């Protein structure tokens, strides 16, 4: 059993599968916002040590693209950063998932790309999706959205 701080109270629970959105990974190497860099690194470290972190092929592609195009990180360095995620569970996007993501986008009024993230998290049986792009606290198909940059949210410990 592990403990998680939930709005100030510790609770015991079984290890959770936690899906990371691209922005959380990008902040780990973005030097423009030190607070988000620190928070992202802490969350990823904590989840990796205490839970089961999950990504998808979409997240890895977006991470590589954002780090090389927006952050101007050298392509070989960015490739090595992607390689560092090899020990996490990686969900491979397929046609059925794309079709499901379209349904999610229609039902929940989300962008297709955000819907594909939700679908990948659902396929991996994740309890939480860590992102600053979706509505924190919202539950979509049983997955709770968590924005780690909002103080009232869950911080995994």
Protein language model features and the residues they cover:
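Hydrophobic helix-cap positions at the C-terminus of alpha-helices
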Residues: 46-47, 85, 104
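Active-site neighborhoods of divalent-metal-dependent phosphate/nucleic-acid chemistry enzymes
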Residues: 90-132
């Amino acid at each position: 059993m592990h403990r998680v701080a939930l709005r100030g109270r510790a609770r015991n629970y079984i290890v959770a599968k936690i899906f990371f959105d691209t922005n959380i990974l990008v902040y780990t190497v973005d030097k423009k916002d030190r607070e988000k860099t620190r928070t992202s690194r802490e969350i990823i470290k904590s989840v990796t040590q205490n839970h089961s972190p999950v990504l998808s092929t979409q997240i890895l592609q977006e991470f590589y693209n954002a780090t090389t195009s927006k952050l101007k990180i050298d392509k070989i360095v960015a490739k090595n950063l992607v390689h560092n995620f090899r020990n996490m569970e990686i969900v491979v996007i397929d046609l059925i998932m794309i079709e499901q993501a379209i349904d999610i986008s229609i039902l929940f009024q989300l962008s297709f790309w955000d819907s594909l993230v939700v679908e990948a998290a659902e396929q991996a049986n994740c309890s939480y999706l860590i992102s600053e792009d979706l509505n924190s606290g919202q539950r979509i198909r049983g997955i709770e959205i968590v924005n780690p940059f909002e103080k009232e949210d869950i911080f995994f410990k």
